[in-house]
């Protein structure tokens, strides 16, 4: 009986040949399967973590893009609101400048017209005084004798002067337009 018992033990006992090889791969395969499943689980957890991180980063980027788009939209609305006011101010400024330039031109033209009329009036006044002084008989013997007459119509003065100096008379006839404001 001892031998019989030994034989089954010997059969069950590990030998250097086949039985050890069969047990080791079974142990190794189960260990590798466990390791693989553990790695898969770790990888799947890593993948899930990466996916969550990617989703969160995407959410942050979308949020910042939405914020930027909203800010741009607000600025565009403000600009559309303020642009007509700026254009109206610019138009009003240009109108004011044009009005000032026109006023300056009209004022300058008025001064020039006034100066020309005043100059014409002063010439006329001088001629009238000369005629009046000589008409009244205030003649100077050294200058000679001045005789003259004038006629005033609605728009001009007709002047005829005769100056007697030396040998012969000098006759001056002139029509002077009168400065009439319209």
Curated annotation (Swiss-Prot):
Q: Which domain of life does the protein's organism represent?
A: Eukaryota
* Annotated GO biological process: positive regulation of acrosome reaction; positive regulation of flagellated sperm motility involved in capacitation
KW Repeat (keyword) present: yes
Q: In which tissues is it expressed?
A: Specifically expressed in testes and mature spermatozoa (at protein level).
Question: What does the entry list under GO cellular component?
Answer: acrosomal vesicle
Query: By its UniProt entry, which SUPFAM superfamilies does this protein fall under?
Result: P-loop containing nucleoside triphosphate hydrolases (SSF52540)
Which compartments does it reside in? Answer: Cytoplasmic vesicle, Secretory vesicle, Acrosome
Q: Which PROSITE patterns match?
A: IQ
Keyword terms of this UniProt record: Cytoplasmic vesicle, Repeat
User: How does gene deletion manifest?
Assistant: Homozygote Iqcf1 mice are significantly less fertile because of reduced sperm motility and acrosome reaction.
Q: Which residues form the IQ domain?
A: 45-74, 101-130
What is its quaternary makeup?
A: Interacts with calmodulin.
Query: Function of this protein?
Result: Involved in sperm capacitation and acrosome reaction.
Protein name per UniProt: IQ domain-containing protein F1
Species of origin reads Mus musculus (Mouse)
